[in-house]
C-alpha cells in the first residue's frame, strides 16, 4: 500500500469538507514521532488564499477528520499545522496484508513504462577503474527498483568500443606479434600504456596507427578481427567486475558505439535536410538558441567534423533515435558523470527538434559527483595512478574478511571468506548509494566497514539480528490478529508501511539514497523497538504481534538491500 497516498486522500476529503478543495494538502512525515505520524502543512497557504484565520481553518480540517477510519487524531499546532496520528487498528490490518503478500504490500505501478537505462559504459581497451564504479552501481540500483515496480527495463551498456585509440592499439598489436608470434594480450592496462608511449614518441608509428583507423572505419576484415580481440578481452574484464559487484548487467546488454556506425551519416543528413544542421567552417553544426554564451551567441552542437569525421554527439543522436524508434522507450535515463550535463541537455534539445524524442517520451540525465580521497582530491593510488576497480574490490573483501575473523575467531576460513565478500562488496556499494548521487563523497574504508552508523554492515547485521530472533522463537502464530499497543510498535508499523512510497520516489527521481535512508531508519527503529519491547519474553497476542513486526522488518531489509544490489546473511 502507499501509506502517504492513503493519508493524503483522507486529508484531501477533509480539505473539501472545510471548503478548500482546490488547495494542496502538503503532507509530510512528522520530524518528531511524539507529535504523530504525519503533518499537514497546506492550511496556511489555503488560509492566505481564502483570507481566513489559518488556525481556525486548520481546526475545521481537524474536525472534519474526527471519527476517520485511518486517522485516530488530528491536532492543530503552531500557526496552522495539523499533526496526524494513525489508528493502530488501521496499521495492524495493513501489517497483516503486507505479511501475506510476496511483495510486502508494495503494489506495482498502474502506469508501467519501457525504460531504457544507460549505465556503466566504460571505454574499452583499458581495465575498469574507480571512476566507473558510481555509474555502474547507481544505474544497477535504479534499474532494479524500476523493474520491481512493474516497469520493463532495458539495460544498455554503451561501451566505448570505437575511435582513434583502436588504430594505435591495432598497430602496436601487429608490431608485437611480428616480433613474437606467440604474443598474447594479457595485461590490457600495460599494453595500452606501452602503445600510447610509442604513439607519442614515434611519428612513423603514429602515422601507421592513423592508417589503421582508416582501415578500421572502412571495414577491413583483418583489422576488424584484431579490433575484436581488444573488444572481447575488455568486455570479459568488465563482466568479471560486474559479477563481483553482483550487477545485473550481462553481455547481451552491451550496445557499444560501433553499433551505430552505419547510422551516423544518415542522422547528419537528416538534420541537414530538416534545416537543423548547417555548415560552419567545414563542419556540420546545430546552433541552439536555448544555450547561449555570455555574448548571447547560440551554442554550437557539432554533429560532424570538418573532413567528415563523427563525434560523440553524432553517435549519441543515432543511439537515442534507436532507443526510441526500435526499443520503443517511454523513458530514457543516462547515468553519467555530472560533468557531461550540458552535452546531454543539448542532445535532448536537438533530438526534440529533430523528432527523435517525441514529447510523450521522457529523457533524463542522471548525473553523479566524484569519488574523492581523504585529501579532498579525486581518489587515486598513493603514486597518483588511477585505481583499478578490480583491485579496489579485492581490497574491500580482504579488509572485510579480516574484520570478520577478528570479531568471530571461531569461524572457519571458508565461512569467514564468504561473509567477508558479502560485507566488503556491500560496504563499497552502500557507501556510494547512501549518498545523494549529485554530491561528491569521500571514500573512507574505516567509515564504510563500520558496524555502527549508516553503513551496509550495520544494516546487514540488523537483518541477522532479526533472523536470530526466529531461530530462538519456536512455534508462533504468523496469522494471529496484529495488536499494536506500545508507541514503538505503532511507530515501526507505520514506517514499514512506507516502503511502497519510498520505492515510488526512487523510481520517479532516480535517487537511490532515498531507499538507503529508509532502510537505515527501519534498522534503527527496529533496534529501539527490540530494546523497549521484549519479543520472545512477551506472551500471547503481544508475542505474536511483535514477531510479525520483526518478520516484516527482516523481509523489508532483505528486499530493500536487494534493490540496492546488496546481499544479506543469516549469520555474521
Swiss-Prot record:
PANTHER family: ARGININE--TRNA LIGASE, CYTOPLASMIC, ARGINYL-TRNA SYNTHETASE
Top-tier EC class: ligase
Entry annotated with the keyword Cytoplasm: yes
Keywords recorded for this protein, A-Z: Aminoacyl-tRNA synthetase, ATP-binding, Cytoplasm, Ligase, Nucleotide-binding, Protein biosynthesis
Similarity comment text for this entry: Belongs to the class-I aminoacyl-tRNA synthetase family.
Gene responsible for this protein: argS
Descriptive protein name: Arginine--tRNA ligase
Source taxon at top rank: Bacteria
Amino acid at each position: 500500500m502507499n501509506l502517504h497516498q492513503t493519508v493524503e486522500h483522507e486529508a484531501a476529503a477533509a480539505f473539501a469538507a472545510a471548503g478548500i478543495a482546490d488547495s494542496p494538502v502538503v503532507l509530510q512525515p512528522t520530524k518528531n514521532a511524539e507529535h504523530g505520524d504525519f503533518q499537514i502543512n497546506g492550511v496556511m497557504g489555503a488560509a492566505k488564499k481564502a483570507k481566513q484565520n489559518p488556525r481556525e481553518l486548520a481546526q475545521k480540517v481537524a474536525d472534519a477528520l474526527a471519527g476517520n477510519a485511518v486517522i485516530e487524531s488530528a491536532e492543530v499546532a503552531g500557526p496552522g499545522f495539523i499533526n496526524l496520528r494513525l489508528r493502530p487498528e488501521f496499521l495492524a490490518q495493513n501489517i497483516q496484508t503486507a505479511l501475506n503478500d510476496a511483495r510486502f504490500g508494495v503494489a506495482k505501478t498502474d502506469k508501467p513504462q519501457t525504460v531504457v537505462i544507460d549505465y556503466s559504459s566504460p571505454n574499452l581497451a583499458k581495465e575498469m577503474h574507480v571512476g566507473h564504479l558510481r555509474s555502474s552501481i547507481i544505474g544497477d540500483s535504479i534499474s532494479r527498483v524500476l523493474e520491481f515496480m512493474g516497469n520493463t527495463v532495458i539495460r544498455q551498456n554503451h561501451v566505448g568500443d570505437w575511435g582513434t585509440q583502436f588504430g594505435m592499439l591495432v598497430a602496436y598489436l601487429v608490431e608485437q606479434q611480428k616480433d613474437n608470434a606467440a604474443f598474447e594480450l594479457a595485461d590490457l592496462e600495460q599494453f595500452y600504456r606501452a602503445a600510447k608511449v610509442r604513439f607519442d614518441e614515434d611519428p612513423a608509428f603514429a602515422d601507421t596507427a592513423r592508417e589503421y583507423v582508416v582501415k578500421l572505419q572502412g571495414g577491413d576484415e583483418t583489422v576488424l578481427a584484431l579490433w575484436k580481440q581488444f573488444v572481447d578481452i575488455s568486455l570479459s574484464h568488465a563482466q568479471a567486475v560486474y559479477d563481483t559487484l553482483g550487477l545485473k548487467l550481462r553481455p547481451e546488454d552491451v550496445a557499444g558505439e560501433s553499433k551505430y556506425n552505419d547510422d551516423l551519416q544518415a542522422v547528419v543528413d537528416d538534420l541537414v535536410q530538416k534545416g537543423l544542421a548547417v555548415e560552419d567552417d567545414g563542419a556540420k553544426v546545430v546552433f541552439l538558441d536555448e544555450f547561449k554564451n555570455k555574448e548571447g551567441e547560440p551554442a554550437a552542437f557539432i554533429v560532424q567534423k570538418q573532413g567528415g569525421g563523427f563525434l560523440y554527439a553524432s553517435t549519441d543522436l543515432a543511439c537515442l533515435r534507436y532507443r526510441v524508434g526500435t526499443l520503443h522507450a517511454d523513458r530514457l535515463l543516462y547515468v553519467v558523470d555530472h560533468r557531461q550535463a550540458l552535452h546531454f541537455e543539448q542532445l535532448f534539445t536537438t533530438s526534440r527538434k529533430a523528432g527523435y524524442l517525441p514529447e510523450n517520451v521522457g529523457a533524463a540525465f542522471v548525473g553523479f559527483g566524484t569519488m574523492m580521497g581523504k585529501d579532498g582530491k579525486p581518489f587515486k593510488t598513493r603514486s597518483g595512478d588511477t585505481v583499478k576497480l578490480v583491485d579496489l574490490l579485492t581490497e574491500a573483501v580482504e579488509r572485510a574478511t579480516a574484520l570478520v575473523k577478528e570479531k568471530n575467531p571461531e569461524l572457519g576460513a571458508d565461512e569467514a571468506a564468504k561473509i567477508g565478500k558479502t560485507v566488503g562488496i556491500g560496504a563499497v556499494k552502500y557507501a556510494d548509494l547512501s549518498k545523494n548521487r549529485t554530491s561528491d563523497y569521500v571514500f573512507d574504508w574505516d567509515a564504510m566497514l563500520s558496524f555502527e552508523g549508516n553503513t551496509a554492515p550495520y544494516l546487514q547485521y540488523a537483518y541477522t539480528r532479526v533472523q536470530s530472533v526466529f531461530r530462538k522463537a519456536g512455534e508462533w502464530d504468523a496469522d494471529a490478529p496484529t495488536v499494536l499497543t506500545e508507541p514503538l510498535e505503532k511507530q515501526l508499523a507505520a514506517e514499514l508501511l512506507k516502503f511502497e512510497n519510498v520505492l515510488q520516489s526512487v523510481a520517479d527521481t532516480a535517487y537511490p539514497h532515498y531507499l538507503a535512508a529508509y532502510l537505515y531508519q527501519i534498522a534503527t527503529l527496529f533496534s529501539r523497538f527490540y530494546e523497549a519491547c521484549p519479543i520472545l519474553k512477551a506472551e500471547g497476542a503481544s508475542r505474536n504481534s511483535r514477531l510479525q513486526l520483526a518478520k516484516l522488518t527482516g523481509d523489508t531489509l532483505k528486499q530493500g538491500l536487494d534493490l540496492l544490489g546488496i546481499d544479506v546473511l543469516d549469520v555474521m
